[in-house]
From Swiss-Prot:
<keyword id="KW-0902">Two-component regulatory system</keyword>
<keyword id="KW-0472">Membrane</keyword>
<dbReference type="InterPro" id="IPR050428">
    <property type="entry name" value="TCS_sensor_his_kinase"/>
</dbReference>
<dbReference type="GO" id="GO:0005886">
    <property type="term" value="C:plasma membrane"/>
</dbReference>
<feature type="transmembrane region" description="Helical">
    <location>
        <begin position="188"/>
        <end position="208"/>
    </location>
</feature>
<keyword id="KW-0808">Transferase</keyword>
<keyword id="KW-1003">Cell membrane</keyword>
<protein>
    <recommendedName>
        <fullName>Sensor histidine kinase TrcS</fullName>
        <ecNumber>2.7.13.3</ecNumber>
    </recommendedName>
</protein>
<keyword id="KW-0597">Phosphoprotein</keyword>
<feature type="domain" description="Histidine kinase">
    <location>
        <begin position="284"/>
        <end position="502"/>
    </location>
</feature>
<dbReference type="GO" id="GO:0005509">
    <property type="term" value="F:calcium ion binding"/>
</dbReference>
<dbReference type="GO" id="GO:0005524">
    <property type="term" value="F:ATP binding"/>
</dbReference>
<dbReference type="GO" id="GO:0004672">
    <property type="term" value="F:protein kinase activity"/>
</dbReference>
<dbReference type="Pfam" id="PF00512">
    <property type="entry name" value="HisKA"/>
</dbReference>
<dbReference type="GO" id="GO:0000155">
    <property type="term" value="F:phosphorelay sensor kinase activity"/>
</dbReference>
<dbReference type="GO" id="GO:0000160">
    <property type="term" value="P:phosphorelay signal transduction system"/>
</dbReference>
<keyword id="KW-0106">Calcium</keyword>
Length: 509
């Protein structure tokens, strides 16, 4: 069956940050990453635009200088000056106005008739692969573009017509690409370093800011482990004043928790006071009821001594009065015992042999319920515990009585004693009472040791007041032990664990 969507706990996906520290850290890193990446991208694009503009300007200046040098060369050729007599392949090397890295060429009918690559050491003819790359393109005076020119790499190139020839210029992009690449590497490194520093600072700042919240949580966890069921317990733990400042969110949580603890502490004190008054009332009422009940029972017995002179209906009525007076007296005695045990009545403790006590109790039960089969699974040697003999005998008797009263004849009841050096409440002595009668209703099982609780109809014959197991639980608690009940698959087991004394520990070592 699928739990209701309003009550079932929703488990967060494994990819989702679970702690507030992780959420804050990832949130800050996400925001800082977006901002730094945006700034880095803008700076790289800005630098790229600036370098491109510089290359465009240099390309225009280079083409202008080539036009000027080409015009002077043609004018010199018409006046038969020494420069004008040089072939174009030589004259191009003498052209001026070019910066290192620039490439110029003069084409005639798509064929390079002169070229020069400028450097710090002067001009030299363009390599053959560069010339082939230039001649492979169609230069029709379009806008500047980027071309890969063989061994020289990427160039931003342009051309213009000059009579029957075409002038070609190219500005190297090697330096510009290096600058942009270096800028990208620097930006990535700075973004990474900034993220590392931001993460470290965020972890420290968030950890410092959340310390009050952790202290508040520690206070709540401490209260959660307190035994609030004790009558004399008070919640003395509070969030310290420094963590209850209402001007911040953590302080609001701490202040609210203190108010909650005050309210719970007051409610517990009120409950304890009510319980104490109720116990005192039960004790007083039990004391007051014992005398009139004894009188009723006594007068009924006294009157029945002359039963031969009484009508049958009167005889029957007196018998019922006497029987119900006994039941009422037993109920009052049990309530009085429970009240005394709840108030922490001092026990008359001594070291006693639990095995001998159980044997006597089983023998009494076998006489009271001969229709049941009684099996003793007891050790041969004595098992020593420290306790009140009368109370422990009543504990065992109540468990055995519960076994035969609430089961049909023929049921097997097994009583066992085991010494445990490990496990729950160890070292301890475990007394178990097992029967193969009907199972106890699972809905009743968790409340089996409460007052006035009876087993399911399949195990109940209608007798009893529902106080026997409550007395068992109180006696066990008074002896610093524990009692549990299990029922299922045609078997019901009651287990009582009592502390093992040093003498028994030495015996079982």
């Amino acid at each position: 069956m699928i739990p209701d969507r309003n009550t079932r706990s929703r488990k967060a996906p494994c990819w989702r940050p679970r702690s507030l520290r992780q959420q804050l850290l990832l949130g800050v890193l996400a925001v800082v990453t977006v901002v730094l990446v945006a700034v880095g991208v803008v700076s790289v694009l800005s630098l790229s635009g600036y370098v491109t503009a510089m290359n465009d300007a240099e390309l225009v200046e280079s083409l202008h200088a080539l036009n000027h040098s080409y015009t002077r060369y043609r004018d010199s050729a018409q006046t038969s000056t020494p420069t004008g007599n040089l072939p174009m392949s030589q004259a191009v090397l003498e052209f001026t106005g070019q910066t290192p890295g620039n490439l110029i060429a003069v084409l005639h009918d798509g064929v390079v008739i002169g070229s020069a690559v400028f450097s710090e050491d002067g001009a030299r003819p363009a390599p053959p692969d560069v010339i082939r790359a230039i001649e492979a393109q169609v230069w029709d005076g379009g806008p500047p573009r980027v071309e890969s020119l063989g061994s020289l790499g990427a160039y931003q190139v342009d051309s213009s017509a000059a009579g029957a020839d075409r002038l070609f210029v190219g500005v190297s992009l090697s330096l510009a690409n290096q600058i942009i690449a270096r800028k990208k590497v620097t930006t990535v490194a700075l973004v990474g370093a900034a993220l590392v520093v931001t993460a470290a600072l965020t972890v420290w700042v968030v950890g410092y800011a959340l310390r009050p919240l952790r202290r508040v949580a520690a206070t709540a966890a401490e209260v959660a482990t307190m035994p609030l069921t004790d009558d004399d317990h008070q919640i003395s733990v509070r969030v310290r004043p420094g963590d209850t400042d209402p001007d911040n969110e953590v302080g609001i949580v701490g202040h609210t928790l203190n108010r909650l603890l005050d309210n719970v502490d007051g409610a517990l004190a009120h409950r304890v006071d009510s319980d104490l008054r109720m116990r005192q009332f039960i004790t007083d009422a039990s004391h007051e009821l014992r005398t009139p009940l004894a009188a009723i029972q006594g007068y009924a017995e006294l009157t029945r001594q002359d039963s031969s002179d009484l009508p049958p209906t009167t005889e029957y009525a007196l018998a019922r009065i006497e029987s119900e007076a006994r039941r009422m007296t037993l109920l009052v005695d049990e309530l009085l015992l429970l009240s005394r045990l709840s108030e922490g009545e001092d026990l008359e403790t001594e070291d006693l042999d639990l095995t001998d006590l159980v044997i006597n109790a089983v023998n009494d039960a076998a006489v009271a319920a001969p229709t049941h089969r009684w099996v003793k699974n007891l050790p041969d040697e004595p098992v020593w515990v420290n306790g009140d003999h009368a109370r422990l005998h009543q504990l065992v008797s109540n468990l055995l009585t519960n076994a035969w009263v609430h089961t049909q004849p023929g049921v097997t009841v097994t009583i066992g004693i085991t010494c445990h050096r490990t496990g729950p409440n160890a070292p301890c002595v475990e007394l178990s009472v097992t029967d193969d009668g009907p199972d106890i209703d699972p809905e009743i099982l968790p409340h089996l040791f409460d007052r006035f609780v009876r087993a399911s109809k399949s195990r109940s014959n209608g007798s009893g007041h529902g106080l026997g197991l409550a007395i068992v639980s109180s006696i066990v608690k008074a002896h610093r032990g524990s009692v549990t009940a299990e029922s299922g698959n045609g078997q019901t087991v009651f287990r009582v664990r009592l502390p093992m004394i040093e003498q028994q520990i030495a015996t079982t070592a």
